[in-house]
């Protein structure tokens, strides 16, 4: 009898160990990707105007990264990096629409042609997870083609090529494809969340990948009268004071709370939750000081974004990491969690699973490549490099405390120490020539390795002294 008890106990322990191993290897994954949310646009990251109690709660349950980056400074390329696990030169998506943005007489060189749709033969993060037995669903902005169901998603609500919901599109009747109107006046963020919750309930018995790329808080800004009035009465500060935008953030936060409540109600403890933004915020809407510039710029305001990761039993609650990460890191991280090896594709980024478990990863450089033009919003507000463009063709390397910008038009260099100058105001290119040389060598080596295209052909229509009419003083 005693021998039988030992056998039974051993079997139970073995089963429990196997179940634990299986549980950790196949967590549910929820990736919340807010559109155009700036680094400073939540209470968690220092805002005193926007109210985000549920995002605070998520941070208290998990790990907050203070040096997180999007892999590109605007919507489509950042999303392509996340979904493909590859940096921009590999998938060729550098911006939204055409690459020759701005007035042609202000562009000194001819930019590299932009790719607008993620190639069907690129094995996406959803396809990789499907191969591992996951049910996959996306609820919101896709922006990489007409239908994410052709690229690994079993369920798609609201995802198409649209970059924003259009005029009055945050309330039903909707302007976007792949969503059916319910009652008039329904809020799009609310609807996407309810669809996501239905997906969770339906697939709670199997591992699921829930991609929740809200259209909010992208323009056109829109909220309820009640929320707008609330934040008008609250008032803000010179940097954050847009009541409608604040209402949109509160709506996103409330809906994140509903997701967290559902996970708790269903006791889905083995759920990895990521909260982030696709790029920096639009400076005319919300400043990210001390960061310089905003969406579309490769200064910190355009690429530094919030990251919060929660995973019960794995990620230690209420912790902070200063390790730099990017959205390129999640594809290899999910592969690492699932022990996926032979994927038959190159994946950039680094697994951050050791960080989630309280360990460290090796130091590495981060690279950004933007061989095209992106016109300015409003130079008086953009806080950019020149009046005509948010950024001109160039590359960036971040290596430890150091950040180097190289611009292709004139081979101009900017060097900043982010530890002492997070706002990128003090160009140290003449002070540290040895650091410039070392970083340029790394940057050029990376571009060669990844086969990054560099524009060199001069634009015959360029006029050095030309000033577009809207920039001329009246």
Question: Regions from the language model: what does each represent?
Answer:
Residues 2, 15-409, 413-414, 422-442, ...:
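Formylglycine-dependent sulfatase
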Residues 3-12:
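Sec-dependent N-terminal signal peptides
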């Amino acid at each position: 009898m005693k021998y039988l008890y030992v056998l039974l106990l051993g079997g139970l322990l073995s089963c429990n160990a196997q179940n634990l191993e299986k549980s950790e290897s196949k967590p549910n994954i929820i990736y919340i990707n807010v559109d155009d949310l700036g680094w400073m646009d939540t209470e968690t990251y220092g805002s005193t105007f926007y109210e985000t109690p549920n995002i605070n709660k998520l941070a208290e349950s998990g790990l907050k990264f203070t040096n997180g980056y999007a892999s590109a400074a605007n919507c489509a390329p950042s999303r392509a990096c996340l979904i493909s696990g590859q940096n921009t030169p590999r998938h060729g998506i550098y911006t939204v629409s055409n690459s020759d943005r701005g007035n042609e007489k202000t562009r000194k060189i001819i930019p590299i042609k932009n790719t607008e749709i993620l190639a069907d033969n690129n094995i996406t993060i959803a396809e990789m997870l499907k191969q591992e037995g996951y049910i996959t669903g996306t609820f919101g902005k896709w922006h990489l083609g007409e239908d994410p169901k052709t690229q690994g998603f079993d369920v798609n609500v609201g995802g198409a090529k649209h970059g924003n919901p259009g005029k009055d599109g945050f309330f039903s009747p909707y302007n976007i494809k792949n969503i059916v109107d319910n009652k008039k006046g329904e809020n799009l963020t609310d609807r996407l969340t309810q669809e996501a919750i239905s997906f969770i309930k339906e697939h709670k018995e199997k591992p699921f990948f829930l991609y929740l790329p809200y259209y909010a808080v992208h323009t056109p800004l829109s909220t309820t009268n009640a929320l707008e009035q609330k934040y008008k009465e609250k008032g803000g500060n010179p940097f954050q004071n847009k009541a409608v935008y604040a209402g949109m953030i509160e709506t996103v936060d409330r809906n994140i709370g509903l997701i967290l409540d559902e996970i708790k109600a269903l006791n889905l403890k083995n759920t990895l939750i990521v909260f982030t933004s696709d790029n920096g915020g639009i400076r005319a809407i919300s400043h990210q000081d001390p960061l310089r510039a905003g969406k579309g710029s490769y200064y910190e305001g355009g690429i530094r974004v919030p990251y919060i990761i929660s995973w019960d039993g794995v990620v230690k609650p209420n912790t902070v990491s200063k390790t730099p990460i990017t959205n390129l890191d999640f594809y290899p991280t999910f592969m690492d969690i699932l022990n996926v090896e032979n994927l038959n594709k190159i994946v950039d980024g680094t697994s951050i699973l050791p960080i989630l478990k309280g360990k460290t990863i090796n130091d590495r450089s981060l690279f950004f490549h933007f061989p095209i033009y992106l016109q300015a919003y409003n130079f008086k507000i953009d806080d950019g490099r020149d009046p005509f463009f948010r950024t001109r063709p160039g590359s960036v390397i971040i290596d430890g405390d150091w950040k180097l910008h190289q611009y292709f038009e004139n081979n101009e260099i900017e060097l900043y120490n982010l530890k002492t100058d997070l706002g990128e105001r003090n160009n140290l290119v003449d002070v540290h020539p040895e650091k410039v040389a070392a970083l340029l060598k790394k940057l050029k080596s990376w571009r060669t390795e990844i086969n990054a295209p560099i524009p060199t052909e001069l634009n015959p229509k360029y006029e050095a002294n030309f000033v577009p009419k809207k920039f001329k003083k009246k």
